[in-house]
């Protein structure tokens, strides 16, 4: 098994890195294509023909986009697998091997962006089908992103990048930080979140509040952890992939959230939905409508359920409302209040996102308002935790995560600072980090990455 969270992936990435630097640069894209197809074939073999077929149709249409009917046919070819394998099974209640195939939302949007960029003249159509397939199937981003633009990723594969020990070590550090987020924060938070959302009526308001907040933390640690892992592997290979997160819990508006959270999706929505609708160069009413439509599309991309559509609509409505607020007044206290308020909106919307249905979300919100008590401070076992130590480790992991984000928000690069220390001090820090990771990580019973389902 070579899922990103498995030891098999570490071995797979290490072997690929060795072959990568042994391979002549003009042939590296072919090596990567083989690695991509092997990776996807192991994880989701039934969907491999769908990926290959959709990529072929988009490649064929991309060479003929001067004709609008061909361009539209290419868009249909890119979007059809998403409609047939994600939305149709959800609408009809089908459960099968191909239902919601792994990574289908990611390679679909990448193929759409390629086709649109060719149509607009931003890039030249790819002559080789295999190279487009390499782009669409890129193993580091096919399951959870980040979204890559064709003109940003593919030229890197032809550059004569040589081995750089310092760069590779930075990549390993970043991947290790991603595994810490996943195993020490996300998977520990998942225990509480799954317990609370399964039966909201059984918990008091403090436990429900904790469950709602912890899901936001879980999703951030899980998703950004994955991003750190794959960006670290990319760094080892000498590939620069787009950043996907920038301290989202420090956002001071809903608009600012989307400049910090799932950044590559936000940019995709801006370039291929919002701007074609008219963007902000129109009347205020139409601008508001464009925002709402864009985020409804975002919700629909995440899933076919009403919970996703409502979640997306809420983000669109909040951004539209922010456009009509008076200018901000400066001040640290006002900024802190805006950050706190924005986090409440983010966490509240994510309750709907996580809920199994709108009724499940309503039950949880009702419990927050009506269920008295404060057992969150004592009865940890009710939340699925097996010991007080497990609860302490959860909060300690969150504290470390927030402390690192706070440093980054102030412009402090911890990796740079550590690298500048004398060798004994630097390695002492590395050893402490390894011990903390081994002590705090939840290595048994952890789940897959949350965003792999989208």
Regions picked out by a protein language model, each given a short descriptive name:
Residues 1-453:
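Membrane-embedded transmembrane alpha-helical bundles that form the catalytic cores
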């Amino acid at each position: 098994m070579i899922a990103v969270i498995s030891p098999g992936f570490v071995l797979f990435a290490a072997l690929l890195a060795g072959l990568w630097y042994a391979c002549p640069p003009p042939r590296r894209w072919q090596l990567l294509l083989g690695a991509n197809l092997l990776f996807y074939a192991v994880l989701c073999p039934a969907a491999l023909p769908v990926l290959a077929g959709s990529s072929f149709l988009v490649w064929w249409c991309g060479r003929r986009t001067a004709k609008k009917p061909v361009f539209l046919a290419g868009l249909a070819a890119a979007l059809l697998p998403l409609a047939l394998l994600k939305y149709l099974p959800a609408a009809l209640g089908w459960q099968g091997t191909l239902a919601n195939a792994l990574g289908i939302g990611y390679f679909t949007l990448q193929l759409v962006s390629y086709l649109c960029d060719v149509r607009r003249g931003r890039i030249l159509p790819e002559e080789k089908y295999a190279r487009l397939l390499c782009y669409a199937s890129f193993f580091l981003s096919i399951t959870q992103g980040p979204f890559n633009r064709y003109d940003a990723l593919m030229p890197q594969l032809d550059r004569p990048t040589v081995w750089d020990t310092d760069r590779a070590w930075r990549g390993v550090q970043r991947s290790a930080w991603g595994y810490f987020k996943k195993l020490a924060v996300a998977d520990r938070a998942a225990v509480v979140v799954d317990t609370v959302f399964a039966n909201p009526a059984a918990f008091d308001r403090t436990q429900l509040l904790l469950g709602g907040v912890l899901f936001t933390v879980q999703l951030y640690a899980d998703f950004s952890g994955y991003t750190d892992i794959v960006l670290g592997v990319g760094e080892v290979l000498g590939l620069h992939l787009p950043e996907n997160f920038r301290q989202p819990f420090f956002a001071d508006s809903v608009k600012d959230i989307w400049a910090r959270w799932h950044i590559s999706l936000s940019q995709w929505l801006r370039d291929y939905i919002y701007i074609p609708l008219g963007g902000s160069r129109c009347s205020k009413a139409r601008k508001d409508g464009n925002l709402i439509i864009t985020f409804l599309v975002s919700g629909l991309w995440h899933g076919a359920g009403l919970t996703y559509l409502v979640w997306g609509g809420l983000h669109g409505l909040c951004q539209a409302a922010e456009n009509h607020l008076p200018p901000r007044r400066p001040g640290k206290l006002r900024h802190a209040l805006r950050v706190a308020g924005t986090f409440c909106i983010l966490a509240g919307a994510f309750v709907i996102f996580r809920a199994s249905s709108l009724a499940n979300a309503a039950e949880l919100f009702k419990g927050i308002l009506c269920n008295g008590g404060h057992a969150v401070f004592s009865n940890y076992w009710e939340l699925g935790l097996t010991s007080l130590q497990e609860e302490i480790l959860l909060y300690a992991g969150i504290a470390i995560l927030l402390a690192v984000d706070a440093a980054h928000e102030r412009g402090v690069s911890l990796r740079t600072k550590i690298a500048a220390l004398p060798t004994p001090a630097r390695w002492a820090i590395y050893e402490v980090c390894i011990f903390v990771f081994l002590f705090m990580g939840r290595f048994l019973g952890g789940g897959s990455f949350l965003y792999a389902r989208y």
